[in-house]
Amino acid sequence: MAIIEQSAATKKVIDGIELTPKVVTPLSQPIFETFEQERQHRKEKLAGAMRIFGRLGFGEGVAGHITVRDPEFTDHFWVNPFAKSFRYMSVSDLLLVNHDGDVVYGSQPVNRAAFCIHAAIHQARPDVIAAAHAHSPYGKSWSSLGRKLDPITQDSCYFYEDHTVITEQGGAVVVEIAAGKEIAAKFPKGKAAIHQNHGLFTVSETVDAAAFWFITMERTCQAQLMAEAVGTPKLIPHEMASYTRDLTGFPAAGWLQFQPLWQEICRTDPDLFD
């Protein structure tokens, strides 16, 4: 009896909950039973990502777009309409466009450049579900150098040996299908591309990951521009850069990194679901 009482007395309890190891379920990507459910989810994430881009100052007039492949009609993709503010994007605003550039769902015009470049990327790469592009300040500044990013920070390792520089059509407004295909042909793999004198493109299996890769790539451009303004950055060795990329740079990790931003925009902008 004395032993039992002593054991009970040593229990650690807060708010009536015994402090013992618990089975905790990690965050994971949702699984859908129907195309309709998955379509709605992708559209919600697209509208939310657009609002986040607007909040972060990535809007530049009518430039910029995020696309996501339709889960059922995979040769079609959803995209933000032309000349609609990133910061006020809602699910009901989104357009469905085919690979001929026709709007097949929705009543607003589509950005011709969004069609020409993104359609070509989606066609060339079946692995790409979502693609993001904007005329963000540091991305377009860095693109003028025509260089890849260096592994100078832990975050920059997301892109180590996993992004490319595209010089074709650099600086030109791409409104021809052939020009879009020329760009896409130089982006056969990897999560990101720097289009010279234009800006950044990121792709992934989810809107979440494509959006996060864009956000962190923009900040990586900023970090390298700042570092090189005052000196010569020390590079992370190949072994460490590769290790960090493999540990943190895969699609599910990009999805996870986006979740705090998603939680915030859902709380502050519930009308995005309209």
Per-segment meaning from a language model:
Residues 118, 139, 180-184, 214:
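A general structural signal for well-ordered alpha-helical packing
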Residues 137-179:
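Class I SAM-dependent methyltransferase SAM-binding "motif I" and its flanking Rossmann-like core
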